[in-house]
């Protein structure tokens, strides 16, 4: 065998092998590689999308927490304002009640003083009549007595 023939035969066998690989093996292999590349690309896109969604979710969580804090602070401020209103209303009510009780006590004191004065006047008038009676050694009639007492009470 001649070396040229061997090289020629090997070249034909190699060309046949290249043709078989290029027509029968290479297209399905390329197809599988492309499918794998597409799956990897889809996976990377899904991962990117997941990262974006995660970032959006975290932003929404931050906004929600911020809103919740603001709402809580607002509720606390309203509660403090309401407590202040209740305290002020209670103070005003206590002052009103104190004034009312003071007025009632003042009226009661004045009424008691008036009763005591009237009683004292009656007692003084009786003592005065008894003293005058003893001095004059005679009795004064009731009408004259009443008239004198009324004049005396008016002067007092």
UniProtKB/Swiss-Prot annotation:
Keywords: ATP synthesis, Cell inner membrane, Cell membrane, CF(0), Hydrogen ion transport, Ion transport, Membrane, Transmembrane, Transmembrane helix, Transport. The chain crosses the membrane at residues 3-23. One of its GO terms (cellular component) is plasma membrane. It is found in: Cell inner membrane. GO terms for molecular function: proton-transporting ATP synthase activity, rotational mechanism; proton-transporting ATPase activity, rotational mechanism. CDD domains: ATP-synt_Fo_b. It is a single-pass membrane protein. Its main location: membrane. Pfam families: ATP-synt_B (PF00430). It comes from the Bacteria. The keyword rRNA processing does not apply. PANTHER family: ATP SYNTHASE SUBUNIT B, ATP SYNTHASE SUBUNIT B', CHLOROPLASTIC. F-type ATPases have 2 components, F(1) - the catalytic core - and F(0) - the membrane proton channel. F(1) has five subunits: alpha(3), beta(3), gamma(1), delta(1), epsilon(1). F(0) has three main subunits: a(1), b(2) and c(10-14). The alpha and beta chains form an alternating ring which encloses part of the gamma chain. F(1) is attached to F(0) by a central stalk formed by the gamma and epsilon chains, while a peripheral stalk is formed by the delta and b chains. Belongs to the ATPase B chain family. F(1)F(0) ATP synthase produces ATP from ADP in the presence of a proton or sodium gradient. F-type ATPases consist of two structural domains, F(1) containing the extramembraneous catalytic core and F(0) containing the membrane proton channel, linked together by a central stalk and a peripheral stalk. During catalysis, ATP synthesis in the catalytic domain of F(1) is coupled via a rotary mechanism of the central stalk subunits to proton translocation. This is ATP synthase subunit b. It comes from Xylella fastidiosa (strain M12).
